[in-house]
């Protein structure tokens, strides 16, 4: 009797472990997060290059040129292992030159990279101009450094502390914990700006009634251009295809193209109030997505609860709020505020911009609806079937990736 009971308990334990291993909340490859360099898989070509560098470093230096080559190979090897070094040196050089110059006005050529430009005299408002592109470009480098530094120096040791031994799972946690950090800052920052504006709780009429918003407060412009830099940096990594593409790679590329078009058009044509609301909907929902995936990697009992919160915020922010904005384009765009095309006064809220705004937001909504279908399918299986298998995750599961990792170590 005891033996039979023990066998039954063992079977339950095995089944529970199997079910947990099949859990794929952590493998939901949707949302806007793009992997960083620190989380990229090591290819055969990169391994061969590393071997060549190590061979060159261990060789004898017969000439001065050999010593220079060793210095160069040493730097390349360090940069290969710590990909944040190059952007760090660029940032240090630019910041040092700017602050040591003693000139922190817009007459300094470096000002357009380090600080926002076009301050309206005697006010906290800032206009827009071509120099804003320099700011976005420089902070693309900043976000590259921040992402890789946090992953390599802060998050990776933390995953070791949490006893995450699988390299594959560790890399996935690097991506998601960075997303938690970024969205955990940008989401509340955006909500703070919204709270101190006339848009609180996603009001739509002020988006059109006060148009055009030609100047923005300091924090608003910092937030908007910072988000532009973040998304542009993400897009660059995505286009380079430094990681094996996800199954929804085309949808992800399409999502980034639409997002960048929305950022550019909303900024240039003064629809930044609408852009602020859309930024917030993406950041807050992505925070809960990354949090649920991270908890899943840690086999936390809170995973289902947080995943439920994620589903709620995703539906409310990415669908209810976004569809309300779409509806406002059809019902309020013409009637609230000026509705005229006038290049002299920068009035672009007219019959030309209405369909463009609607199509771009609708395109974003279509991608989100596709991802919602996948989310609800996982939620259904979680509730009714007790599994969380995601059929649209990478072709290799966590388990197969970890098996390959073990084979490589054995070889």
Curated annotation (Swiss-Prot):
GO MF term list: sphingosine N-acyltransferase activity
Pathway, per record: Lipid metabolism; sphingolipid metabolism
Keyword Disulfide bond carried by entry: no
EC id: 2.3.1.297
Gene Ontology biological process terms from the UniProt entry: ceramide biosynthetic process
Modified residues (Phosphoserine): 23-24
Lumenal membrane side: 103-130, 195-217, 269-273, 335-353
UniProt GO cellular component terms: acyl-CoA ceramide synthase complex; endoplasmic reticulum; endoplasmic reticulum membrane
Sequence ranges on the Cytoplasmic membrane side: 1-81, 156-172, 241-249, 296-305, 383-411
Binding-site residues, fumonisin B1: 252, 303-304, 318, 378, 381-382
Induction entry: Expression is controlled by CBF1.
Chief location bin: endoplasmic reticulum
Sugar-modified residues: 103
Assembly and oligomerization: Component of the ceramide synthase complex composed of at least LAC1, LAG1 and LIP1. Forms a heterotetrameric complex, where one unit of the LIP1 homodimer interacts with LAC1 and the other with either LAC1 or LAG1.
Family (UniProt): Belongs to the sphingosine N-acyltransferase family.
Name of this chain's protein: Ceramide synthase LAG1
Taxonomic source organism: Saccharomyces cerevisiae (strain ATCC 204508 / S288c)
Gene name, Swiss-Prot/TrEMBL: LAG1
């Amino acid at each position: 009797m005891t033996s039979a009971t023990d066998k039954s308990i063992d079977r339950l334990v095995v089944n529970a472990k199997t079910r947990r291993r099949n859990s794929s909340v952590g493998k939901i490859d949707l949302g806007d997060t793009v992997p960083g360099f620190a989380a990229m898989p090591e290819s055969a070509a990169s391994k061969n290059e590393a071997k060549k560098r190590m061979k060159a470093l261990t060789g004898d230096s017969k000439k001065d040129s050999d010593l220079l080559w060793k210095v160069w190979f040493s730097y390349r090897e360090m940069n290969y292992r710590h990909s944040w070094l190059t952007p760090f040196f660029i940032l240090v050089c630019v910041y040092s030159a700017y602050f040591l110059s003693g000139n922190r006005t817009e007459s300094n050529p470096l000002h357009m990279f380090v600080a926002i430009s076009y301050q309206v005299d005697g006010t906290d408002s800032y206009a827009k101009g071509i120099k804003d592109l320099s700011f976005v470009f420089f902070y693309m480098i900043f976000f590259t450094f921040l992402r890789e530094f946090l992953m390599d120096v802060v998050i990776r040791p933390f995953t070791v502390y949490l006893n995450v031994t699988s390299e594959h799972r560790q890399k996935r946690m690097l991506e998601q914990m960075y997303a938690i950090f970024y969205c955990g800052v940008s989401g509340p920052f955006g909500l703070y700006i919204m709270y101190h504006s006339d848009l609180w709780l996603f009001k739509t009429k002020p988006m059109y009634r006060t148009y055009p918003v030609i100047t923005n407060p300091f924090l608003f412009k910092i937030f908007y251009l910072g988000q532009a830099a973040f998304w542009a940096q993400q897009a660059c990594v995505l286009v380079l295809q430094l990681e094996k593409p996800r199954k929804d790679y085309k949808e992800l590329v399409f999502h980034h193209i639409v997002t960048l078009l929305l950022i550019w058009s909303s900024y240039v044509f003064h629809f930044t109030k609408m852009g602020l609301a859309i930024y917030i909907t993406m950041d807050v929902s992505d925070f809960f997505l990354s949090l649920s995936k991270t908890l899943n990697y840690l086999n936390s009992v809170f995973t289902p609860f947080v995943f439920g919160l994620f589903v709620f915020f995703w539906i409310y922010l990415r669908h209810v709020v976004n569809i309300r904005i779409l509806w406002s384009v059809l019902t309020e765009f013409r009637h609230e505020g000026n509705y005229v095309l006038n290049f002299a006064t920068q009035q672009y809220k007219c019959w030309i911009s209405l369909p463009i705004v609607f199509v771009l937001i609708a395109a974003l909504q279509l991608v989100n609806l596709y991802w919602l279908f996948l989310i609800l399918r996982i939620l259904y299986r979680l509730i009714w079937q007790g599994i969380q298998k995601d059929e649209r995750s990478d072709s290799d599961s966590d388990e197969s990736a970890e098996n390959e990792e073990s084979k490589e170590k054995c070889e």
